[in-house]
Amino acid sequence: MGSLKEGQGRDMEEGESEEPLLMAQNQRFTMFPIRYKSIWEMYKKAEASFWTAEEVDLSTDVQQWEALTDSEKHFISHILAFFAASDGIVLENLAARFLNDVQVPEARAFYGFQIAMENIHSEMYSLLLETFIKDSKEKDRLFNAIETIPCISKKAKWCLDWIQSPMSFAVRLVAFACVEGIFFSGSFCAIFWLKKRGLMPGLTFSNELISRDEGLHCDFACLLYSLLQKQLPLEKVYQIVHEAVEIETEFVCKALPCDLIGMNSNLMSQYIQFVADRLLVTLGCERTYKAENPFDWMEFISLQGKTNFFEKRVGEYQKASVMSNLQNGNQNYEFTTEEDF
C-alpha cells in the first residue's frame, strides 16, 4: 500500500505556515484556555455520543440472517467488509497525518476521541462479520477485502493515496470529508433500507449509531475547513467531490449493486448526488448536481436527520450531563441539514 513517509516529510505549502490551526502552539499540550469555542463544542458533542459494541443485541439478526437470500447475504457481507477496512483507513489518516497537522488542542481532542470511536466502529463491523459468516475461508476473504475484493480495493486506494499525498492540509481535509460524507453514504442508505423492511435490527441499530458518528466527523471536517484562512479554489473542491461521487456510484450501483437487496440503482445514484450537493454547500460551494432526495424515509435517520441527534436518541445515546455546560454555548458554527440551499 506504500509508505506514509513521503507524505509526512512534506514541507508546508505556501500560506500554510500562517494558518492558525496549523501553527505550532506553545500551549498545545494543555487544553485550556479554549481558543475555538466552536471546535470545543464539537468535541463535547462527540464525547456525549460515546457507545460500545456491547450495547448492540445481535440475537435476532443471527436468526434472520439464515432467512436472507443469497443476494442479500452477498450484499451485506461485502458492505460490512468495506466498512471494517475503511474505519481502519480513516484511523490511520488521523493518527499519521491530521494529528500531526493540526496544532490546536481542542481540535486534537476531537481527533483523539474520533480515533477511539473509529476503533469501536471497526470492532462492531468485525463482530458482525464474525457473527454472520461461518465459513473460515470466506471470513478470511472478507477480513482482507482491500486485497481480495477489487471494488473495495479501488475505494481503499483512493483513501490511501490521500493519506500519502504531499498536498496541503486543506486538500486532504476536503478529501476525507468526502470519505466520511460520500463514500459511506450509499452503504449507510442500503442498510437503512433493510431497517425499513424490518430486517436485521442489531445491524441496523449499529448502522444508525455509526452513521451519526460519521455525520459528526464530516461536520467537524467542514468546520475546520471553514476556519482555514486559505481555502481551495472552488474548482479543486468540485474535482475532489466529483471523483468521490463517481467511485461511490460505481461501487454501490454497479460493482456491488444495491438492487441485490431490492433497491433501485438509479435512485441510489441520485441519493449519492444529493448527499454530495449538501456537502458542497457546507464547504461553501454551489450545488452541482441539483439532485433531490429520492428516499423520503432517509429524512429521519442518518446524515439528513441529525437536527435532534444530541437531544434525543433511542437507547439513551447521549451520556448524561456531558452537554449541560454547552446549552448556552458558542453559536459561531451551526451545521444545518435543511434541503433549501
Swiss-Prot record:
Binding note for cofactor: Binds 2 iron ions per subunit.
Catalytic function, reaction form: a 2'-deoxyribonucleoside 5'-diphosphate + [thioredoxin]-disulfide + H2O = a ribonucleoside 5'-diphosphate + [thioredoxin]-dithiol
Regulation: Inhibited by phenol, paracetamol, 2,4,6-trimethylphenol, resveratrol, furfuryl mercaptan, 2-thiophenthiol, phenylhydrazine, and hydroxyurea.
Binding site for Fe cation 1: D87, E118, H121
Gene Ontology cellular component terms for the protein in this record: ribonucleoside-diphosphate reductase complex
Keyword Metal-binding part of the UniProt annotation: yes
Enzyme class: oxidoreductase
The keyword Transmembrane is annotated on this UniProt entry: no
Family: Belongs to the ribonucleoside diphosphate reductase small chain family.
Name of the protein in question: Ribonucleoside-diphosphate reductase small chain A
Protein's organism: Arabidopsis thaliana
Gene: RNR2A
